[in-house]
Amino acid sequence: MTANSIKFTIAFNDPDLDAEEKDEQVQQLISELKQIDEVDTVGRVLDPSPPEGNKALGGFLVGLLMTEVNTANAKKLMGFLGDRLGGKAIELSVEANGKKLTVKAHSREELEAAIKAAQDFIAA
């Protein structure tokens, strides 16, 4: 992460969805984010302590994705997320300038408030 980049971690945490459904939402959003020029990186979040005996090259945490953008493109990304994630239960973490903000949203209104809080946080 460079000095002028902002890291977003998005967790799909709808209790009505099983792990596979959360994973489908992550895959769909990753695919959409990869098509946006302003996004520097996007991907799954690696499990820091995969289960013993896991043969995969590092497992992923279910329902989580991470994306990075530069400061100038953060507002565009948040607008995109607002359009795509309205009405979904998520937790959004924003990391910038060595500080971290985490907000939860369960509706479009809460998501808009969360995005506004994230924008204010980045601007501070």
What is the role of each PLM region?
Residues 1-62, 80-124:
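Short amphipathic alpha-helical segments that predominantly mediate membrane engagement
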Residues 58-67, 71-75:
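Compact, glycine-rich, soluble single-domain proteins
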